[in-house]
Amino acid sequence: MQNVSEREREEMGIVVNYLFSHNFLLKEFEREKYHLAVRNKDIIKQYLQVIGWDFIVDEKHGCIVIVSPHYEHRLKLKKDETIWLLVLRLIYEEKRSALSISQYPFTTLQEIKGKYETFRLPFVSKTKLRELVQIGKQNQLLRPIDNDIESDDCRFQLFHSCIHVLQQGDLNVLYEKIKSYSEGGDHSEMDEETTIN
């Protein structure tokens, strides 16, 4: 830390506090903070290791994540919230293989509903849909492109942070997890890999 200027220390403090409150730092939203964190990744990593946290810099996808040792900071989700995130992650995985790394996958509400139908899961109420979209926005997982989120044509941009929310990247694992809910799996919260703050 001796070679770091006072100004950079202050800026790194802002970055670390941002990560503690948001869990993700996306280049898409916070370009300046992102570049500062990448430039000083070794120092930030050492600092966070002292308190047992992992500092993951995913430059390929423009995403930085912090993870506590036992995932204590995760948000405990209800079953319908878990299903929603699993479906988004599944769509993300299916679409991203056809895109370049710098591009974000898009989906529509109709496509999301279609996944629910595929797994014979009832879709959520309009009120719950608004809550789920808000959770996605707050946690930098998605962004609605259109104003009417209840319209089947409403488009959503899915961010690369989806990779780090649910660690099961394998499509078969995602299918099986969603299928377990359609068969009456009674999980009240997400698995230990979940790192939504």
UniProtKB/Swiss-Prot annotation:
InterPro entries per UniProt? JetB (IPR025449)
Q: Spell out the Pfam families in the cross-references.
A: DUF4194
Q: What happens when the gene is disrupted?
A: When this gene is missing the Wadjet system does not confer plasmid-transformation resistance in B.subtilis.
Question: Which branch of life, at top level?
Answer: Bacteria
Q: What does this protein do?
A: Component of antiplasmid transformation system Wadjet type I, composed of JetA, JetB, JetC and JetD. Expression of Wadjet type I in B.subtilis (strain BEST7003) reduces the transformation efficiency of plasmid pHCMC05.
The protein here is known as Wadjet protein JetB
- Tell me what organism the protein belongs to: Bacillus cereus (strain Q1)
